[in-house]
Amino acid sequence: MQEQYRPDMIEPKVQQYWVENKVFKAIKDESKEKYYCLSMFPYPSGRLHMGHVRNYTIGDVISRYQRMLGKNVLQPFGWDAFGLPAEGAAIKNKTAPAKWTYENIAYMKKQLQLLGFGFDWDREIATCKPEYYKWEQWFFTELYKKGLVYKKTSTVNWCPNDETVLANEQVHEGCCWRCDTPVEQKEIPQWFIKITDYAEQLLGGLDTLPQWPDMVKTMQRNWIGRSEGVEITFDVANTNEKVAVYTTRPDTFYGVSYLGIAAAHPLASLAAQNNPELAAFIQEAKNAKVAEADLATMEKKGMATGLFAIHPLTGEKLPIWVANFVLMHYGTGAVMAVPAHDQRDFEFAQKYSLPIKQVIAPLADEEIDLTKQAFVEHGKLVNSAEFDGKDFDGAFNGIADKLEKLGVGKRQVNYRLRDWGVSRQRYWGAPIPMLTLENGDVVPAPMEDLPIILPEDVVMDGVKSPIKADPNWAKTTLNGTPALKETDTFDTFMESSWYYARYTCPQYQNGMLDAEEANYWLPVDQYIGGIEHATMHLLYFRFFHKLLRDAGFVTSEEPADKLLCQGMVLADAFYYTSPTNERIWVSPTQVTLERDEKGRIIKATDPEGRELVHSGMTKMSKSKNNGIDPQEMVEKYGADTVRLFMMFASPAEMTLEWQESGVEGAKRFLGRVWNLVYQYQQNPAKTSLDITALSAEQKVLRREVHKTIAKVSDDIGRRQTFNTAIAAVMELMNKLTKAPLDSEQDRAVMAEALSAVVRMLYPITPHICFELWQALGNESAIDTAEWVKADEAAMVEDEKLIVVQVNGKVRGKVTVAADADEDTVKTIAFADENVKKFIDNQHIVKVIYVVGKLLNVVVKP
C-alpha cells in the first residue's frame, strides 16, 4: 500500500470493482434471510443535494452492515420521475419534460455512483417509463371494477399558478405546498380512490408498527381522524327541506342556539335565490382559500339565511347561518353550534349577538365565566331536561338513544380522512386509463390498450397541457366505436405508492407483480425518508399495500416494518441588501469568515469585500443559496470523508449542521486510520494471537477492542445511533495509535484490532476499508467479510486498576484482582511505596472505597 491516503486514487478503482463484479446484485435465495433496505427515491431535479446524500448514506450503511451479518440484502434505486417541476423547466429551457428528466437522471446517477452507494442498478426504475405506469393504469381499472374508484364533480383545492388540483395534504396554511401560491376553491370533475373504505384498517395497522416513529403514527392517526358521534337531522321550518349535522358532543344538544352551513351547502343556494346580499356573501366565501388548519385562527364571518331549523327535542326555532368556518367537504357541510361549549361557536355568537346557553357545568364546583370564553371540557348536564346531572357518557348514550327512537338521529363513526383525489390537470404524469363513449358512458380502457402512452416529444407553451391542447390525442376507439381518452393525469403520489413493490420484480412483464418475488422480499425491512411525508406518501404507501394484498399480490399487512425519518441538513446562510432593498444571498463557499475564540462568526465578507449578514443555520435551499454541492465535496475530500461526516455530525433523526471544518476533521481521522495500517504493515505480525501469553497491558488493549465491537454492533444494529458508533471507533483509534508494536504479541493484538476497526468502519467508509482490508493480508474482498464479533471472554476483566487518594489527592494506582474485596484492596494500596509516604505516622480517620474504582484514605496527624 502507498504511504499517503489518496481517496482520488482509491475510490474510482473500488467503484469499478463493484460495478464489474455486480457485488450488490440481489437474487432471491430462500436459504438466506432476506433484508430489504429502501431509501425514498428522489425526484430527478438535476443535481443531488446534501439531503439526498444523507438519506442514501444512512440506507447504505444499514445495507452494508446487514450484508456483513450474512443476510441477502436488496437495496434498489430509481426515480420518481413525473411531476410539475419538469414542466416548468421545460418551458424555461425550451425543451420537453421527458428530455429534461432523462438528462437529469443520467447526471444524478453519475453523482450517486461517485458516492459509492451499494445499489442494485439492475433494478433501476423510472416512473415515467410506460413499462412502469402500464401496470399502475391496469391496477386503476381493476380498482374501478371493484367499485373503489369513482368520478364526481367536487369542490377542490385549485392552485391557479400551477393550474392543478391539490389534495388536502398539499395545502399548507392556505397555500400550495410546492409554489406557495394562495389556493382557491373550484368545482371540477375528479377521479377518486376510496381510501376511506380502508380508514379503519389504516388506523388499526398503526398499532402493528412498533418500529415506526411515534410522531409519524400520531400524525397519521390525527389525519385519519376517527371520531364517534351522532348524525342528527333537523327539519327546516316552513319548507320540506332537512339539514343533517354530525356531532361528537350530543351531550351539548340542548345548548344549540344556531346552525352553521357551508357556502356550498344546497340550503345556502336555496336561501340566496331571492337574497342578492346573501348570494354575494356566499360567492365571496366560496372564493376564500380555507384549509382546515386555518379554521381555528381565521376571522369568523357569517350571514343569516332567513331559514330556521326545528330542534328535534325542544321544538325551538334555530336560525341557520352561512358561516365561513364550515367546510362542505368535511362532515355534512353543516354544524350545530353550541356557543357555551365550543370556542369557535362562541366567537361567532358573540360577534353576531346570538344566544349562549349553558348546558354543561364543571364536575367540580369551579366558577366559569361564559361571557369571556366557552367551557369546552366534559362535565355534568344542566338545563337539559331529563338528562340533568348526567356525565358525558351517560348523556351521550341517553340523548343518542332518544334521537334514534324518534328517527332523527343515528350513532355514527366518522373520519376526517377524505377520499384520494388522483386527477391532475397537468401533462407530465401518467394518463388516467378511462374512456368516454359517444353516449357519455365512462368505461375503463381494456388491458390490450394499455399502456395509454404519454407522448414525450412535445412543446410546452406554459398554458395548457399538450395532450389537452392536441384535439387528436384523445381520439380513440373501443370495439370499433369512437371514444375519448381522459386527458387528466395521475397525481404523482400514485407512482410512489407502489414503487417499493415493483423493485422486487422490475423486469416482470406478465403482470403488475411477480407474487413469488414480492412475497420473498416484502415487507421492506428498513424504510428511510423525511418526516414531511408522514400524511401524504407514507399514508398512500400503506393504503396501496392493502390494495395489493386484497388483489392477491402480497401477503403482508404493512409495506415496511421499520421507518427511520432522517433530519434535514442545515448550512450557514449569508446575504447583503441591494440598493433596491432586496436580499442577495451569497453561497457559503464564497464567504470569508472571522470567528471569535469560541468559534462564533463575528464577521463575514463576500469576494467583493462586502460585509454580509449571517442569518444563521437554515435548511439548505436554492432560495437562500446555501446548498453545498456534494460533487464538489467528493472531489475535494473523497466520498468516504463526506459519508463519514454525514453519519458522525448528528444523530440520524436530528438536523445536521454542515460545517466544512467537521468534514476536514473526518478526512484527518481517515488519514490516521490509513497511517496506522501502513505503520503496522511495515512490520506485521508473523504469528497468530496467543491469548494465554498476553501481558496485562495487551489484555487491557484487547478488552477495549472487544468492548468497542460490542458497542458499535449495538449502536448500528439495534439503536441506529451511528454517530456514537463512530465516536467509539475514534476513541479506540486514540488508544491504538499509542499502543506499542515492539513484541510479536503486540503486533498480533494490533492485527486483531485493525481487522476489527476496518470492518466496523466498512459500512460507513467502504472504499478506504476495501483497500485496508487487502493491505491487512485478506485474500477475499471485504464486501464478503463477516461482521466482527465481540469476544465475551476478552471483555471480562480479571484485574482492576484502583486509584488511591489520600485526603482527596491522587497518590497512587494499584492493580488488584477483579473480585478483590475491600480488605485486600486496602492491604495492597497501603503497601504501595508512594501511598505509604502519605499515610505513615498519620492517624487514619476513615477509608472510603468505591468498588472497583477508587480508594480514598482520610488521615490527620
Swiss-Prot record:
GO annotation, cellular component aspect: cytosol
Presence of keyword Thylakoid: no
Presence of keyword Cytoplasm: yes
Protein EC: 6.1.1.4
PROSITE patterns (alphabetical): AA_TRNA_LIGASE_I (PS00178)
Subcellular location: Cytoplasm
PANTHER family the record matches: LEUCINE--TRNA LIGASE, MITOCHONDRIAL, LEUCYL-TRNA SYNTHETASE
NCBIfam families named in the record: leuS_bact
Record-given protein name: Leucine--tRNA ligase
